[in-house]
């Protein structure tokens, strides 16, 4: 069981040229590095709520990565709201981070999918089947 969460050195929030607020880095991040781990502290948000609808992630019965590896479909059982910077990252069709959910630890983990320079905004593709933006 995790006893602490990772936030990469230099990761911070500021105004974005893309949309509202965004998550940026003031230090280099290498491909494969964990950018941030966000805790999901409570049970999933019921599917009939309208609260924070634009910031929620779909809560699966199996992680997206595991489903892909096993060749099975992901079933969705509700929504979650990751704490930390999890709901602040902006969208890009050319992302520099990706994410997956560790169901046993109740953590969303964001990972660099390419080398990221200091000063860049950290972006992921909202078109993932697990994001409800």
Residue ranges and their predicted role:
Residues 1-133:
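Conserved catalytic SET/PR domain of SAM-dependent protein methyltransferases, capturing the structural core
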């Amino acid at each position: 069981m995790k006893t602490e969460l990772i936030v990469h050195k230099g990761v911070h929030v500021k105004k974005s040229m893309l949309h509202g607020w965004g998550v940026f880095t003031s230090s280099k991040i290498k491909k494969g590095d964990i950018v941030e781990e966000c805790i999901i502290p409570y049970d999933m948000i019921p599917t009939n709520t309208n609260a924070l609808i634009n910031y929620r992630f779909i809560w699966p019965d199996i992680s997206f990565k595991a489903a892909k590896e096993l060749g099975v479909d992901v079933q969705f059982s509700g929504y979650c709201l990751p704490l930390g910077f999890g709901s602040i990252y902006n969208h890009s069709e050319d992302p520099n981070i990706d994410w997956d959910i560790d169901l046993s630890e109740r953590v969303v983990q964001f990972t660099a999918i390419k080398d990221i320079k200091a000063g860049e905004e950290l972006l992921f593709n909202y078109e993932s089947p697990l994001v409800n933006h």
